[in-house]
Amino acid sequence: MKTAIIQLPGLNRDRDMVAALHHITGVEPLKIWQTESTIPDVDVIVIPGGFSYGDYLRCGAIGARTPVLQAVREKAQKGVTVIGICNGFQILLEAGLLPGTLMRNTSLKFVCREIKLEVVNVNTKFSRYYSKGQIICCPVAHHDGNYFVDSETLKQMEENEQIIFRYAENTNPNGSVNDIAGIINKAGNILGMMPHPENFIEPAHGGTDGRLFFQSALELAKG
């Protein structure tokens, strides 16, 4: 199992992601810097959270236009699994690899707390080890996590079962349409989500609900 983590100036959750991937696979992930125009053969590419390029212009706007993101695009088109968490999700949206956009939280405040998620679709490589309707706990930490998409695209996403996670039990922290917390592309190999499953891997960190997410994605990619 080979994994790679994209590194951009301002991304600050890469060490958390390294720890999570190493915990699941037992192998240290490759670290790919922003200026790289090619990515070695890997099974999974992860874009972690943070504030790439200081969130100038828009969150993820500059990061989406780096050489390494073009390399990510090429890998994704070949079916490689791509995961974007928080700012990584914002970058994938800016790059056009996922539908929709992320706006300022409706509270206009940075939100950092644990929230509840409902697992909506378990027929994906990212959620197959969960149970449909399962409620899991996961932390969030963002200022611009309010997911929005036009009504026609939203209808298509619902029909295509592209929504994997929803905020549950009235814990929507940002005002996202239809409580959407995590989505995939039509092909099912690209995922973006605002919550941080990498922070809930070990009991000492407060929970283990994120472990099944990585086991689902990494073991299926390997297979």
From Swiss-Prot:
One of its GO terms (biological process) is 'de novo' IMP biosynthetic process. The active site is at residues 86, 196, 198. GO terms for molecular function: ATP binding; glutaminase activity; phosphoribosylformylglycinamidine synthase activity. PROSITE patterns: GATASE_TYPE_1. It catalyses: N(2)-formyl-N(1)-(5-phospho-beta-D-ribosyl)glycinamide + L-glutamine + ATP + H2O = 2-formamido-N(1)-(5-O-phospho-beta-D-ribosyl)acetamidine + L-glutamate + ADP + phosphate + H(+); L-glutamine + H2O = L-glutamate + NH4(+). It is found in: Cytoplasm. One of its GO terms (cellular component) is cytoplasm. Its main location: cytoplasm. Residues 2-223 form the Glutamine amidotransferase type-1 domain. Pathway: Purine metabolism; IMP biosynthesis via de novo pathway; 5-amino-1-(5-phospho-D-ribosyl)imidazole from N(2)-formyl-N(1)-(5-phospho-D-ribosyl)glycinamide: step 1/2. InterPro entries: Class_I_gatase-like (IPR029062), PRibForGlyAmidine_synth_PurQ (IPR010075). CDD domains: GATase1_FGAR_AT. Keywords: ATP-binding, Cytoplasm, Glutamine amidotransferase, Hydrolase, Ligase, Nucleotide-binding, Purine biosynthesis. Its EC number is 6.3.5.3, 3.5.1.2. SMART domains: GATase_5. The keyword ATP-binding applies. Part of the phosphoribosylformylglycinamidine synthase complex involved in the purines biosynthetic pathway. Catalyzes the ATP-dependent conversion of formylglycinamide ribonucleotide (FGAR) and glutamine to yield formylglycinamidine ribonucleotide (FGAM) and glutamate. The FGAM synthase complex is composed of three subunits. PurQ produces an ammonia molecule by converting glutamine to glutamate. PurL transfers the ammonia molecule to FGAR to form FGAM in an ATP-dependent manner. Part of the FGAM synthase complex composed of 1 PurL, 1 PurQ and 2 PurS subunits. This is Phosphoribosylformylglycinamidine synthase subunit PurQ. It comes from Bartonella henselae (strain ATCC 49882 / DSM 28221 / CCUG 30454 / Houston 1). The gene is purQ.
